[in-house]
């Protein structure tokens, strides 16, 4: 579809394809190499390995949700440059998704069985945020990323120092998420009301606690 302006229907179809790729197939990425490439894993106990698997499953579920949030916002964004920024961020989130999926498998764990639910719910939230206006949509991105950074920091505190591959992935994700937040604010994002922040935090806890086990 290069060379012509995409219609809203085109974007809906592309979003549907991205949803299928994210939840069931191979998502679109910029093909950046995993930070864990070439990093040796230390001697993990069975307990440490199980904990890492559960936490990386949570991170994978979070990236499924992040991908959906960005795609939902891109679909309803009013300004073309905002839409493109959301789509580019979604590609980078997909890199995180692939990295986490690979690491989950290496740890002998499985990704969340509720992936379609995480994607669908987050896509709707993202679309609604986009409909509220670009400044609020960008503010939503910034707050989401701030919360994700804190969440990653908590995981880094729990994952064994012997699990160098998982830690390398999380450190890079933390850096990327912090940058997304800064870019969103610099592009005109506004700070969200404390009540919205609290609601976002509560929803995040439900997802992380559920994905830890399922």
UniProtKB/Swiss-Prot annotation:
Pfam families per record: COQ7
Residues involved in Fe cation 1 binding: 63, 93, 96, 177
Gene Ontology terms, cellular component aspect? Answer: plasma membrane
GO process annotations (BP): ubiquinone biosynthetic process
Which pathway is recorded for this entry?
Answer: Cofactor biosynthesis; ubiquinone biosynthesis
UniProt: Fe cation 2 binding residues: 93, 145, 177, 180
Q: What does this protein need as cofactor?
A: Fe cation
Task: For this UniProt record, give its keywords in alphabetical order, as a comma-separated list.
Answer: Cell membrane, Iron, Membrane, Metal-binding, Monooxygenase, Oxidoreductase, Ubiquinone biosynthesis
- Subcellular location, record wording: Cell membrane
- InterPro entries under this entry? COQ7_proteobact, Ferritin-like, Ferritin-like_SF, Ubq_synth_Coq7
**E.C. code:** 1.14.99.60
Question: Catalytic activity, per the record?
Answer: a 5-methoxy-2-methyl-3-(all-trans-polyprenyl)benzene-1,4-diol + AH2 + O2 = a 3-demethylubiquinol + A + H2O
Keyword Metal-binding listed: yes
Residue pairs linked by disulfide bridges in the UniProt entry: none
Which molecular-function annotation in GO is an example for this chain?
Answer: 3-demethoxyubiquinol 3-hydroxylase activity
The cofactor note reads: Binds 2 iron ions per subunit.
Q: Provide the membrane topology annotation.
A: Peripheral membrane protein
Family stated for the protein in its record: Belongs to the COQ7 family.
Cite the PANTHER family for this sequence: 5-DEMETHOXYUBIQUINONE HYDROXYLASE, MITOCHONDRIAL, COENZYME Q10 BIOSYNTHESIS PROTEIN 7
Q: What does this protein do?
A: Catalyzes the hydroxylation of 2-nonaprenyl-3-methyl-6-methoxy-1,4-benzoquinol during ubiquinone biosynthesis.
Question: What is this protein's record name?
Answer: 3-demethoxyubiquinol 3-hydroxylase
